[in-house]
């Protein structure tokens, strides 16, 4: 049986769970509480040298990185199909998921989440929070996150993150003009990969960002209607995190809206 090291509210772990649900694949739950730092322990780093979730285990094979996991599952368990039949369609799908790896995840969605909500978890922990931050292997990622934890929405990284999210939503709105899904008439790994990012905006009470993008709003409603949404996302929602995100998101919506106006 497959096994997944994951976290309930991790965007990247959510992607993997959606894919597993769409494929109807059973898997062993190996949930990690990230705020306890278990993912930074040596035993886990042997599985995932970047000390992030998710990590998929398939027999004696270890597959890290969420987008790599999606493609592995598609190749290894091809039914039901979640990629276009033609090479050009597959290339378009990969261009979408490539954005997540390049900057949308770390430099936009994660920064918005930390700048609004998660920074308070680190600040409340004081020295322990700083020690956890120091454990992030990537220097640039660590210092960018440190800045946004210290300054919140006043960090320039936060401003850039919101602007990048606006750009992404505009690109999605344009792509959805000619067909119902991001890469044509069929639901693919591109839709799997981006669904958690709209859910994160919902959790942060920032769905106002899609108010003037009706095609994106409709796409998200259709993603929510799929059985995988309840199975892989709603079922795993952590009420403590939801309360923090919604309360803080509502407080900072005026700042986000102001950044959007100047984007």
What residue ranges belong to the model's regions?
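GST-like fold's C-terminal all-alpha helical module
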Residues: 102-221, 225
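Short, solvent-exposed turn/loop segments enriched in Gly/Ser/Thr/Pro and often Arg
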Residues: 7, 33, 189, 236-237
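GST-like domain detector, emphasizing the conserved glutathione-binding G-site
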Residues: 1-139, 152, 250, 257-263
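A generic structural-conservation signal
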Residues: 29, 53, 185, 210, ...
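Long, positively charged, glycine-interspersed low-complexity recognition regions
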Residues: 212, 217-263
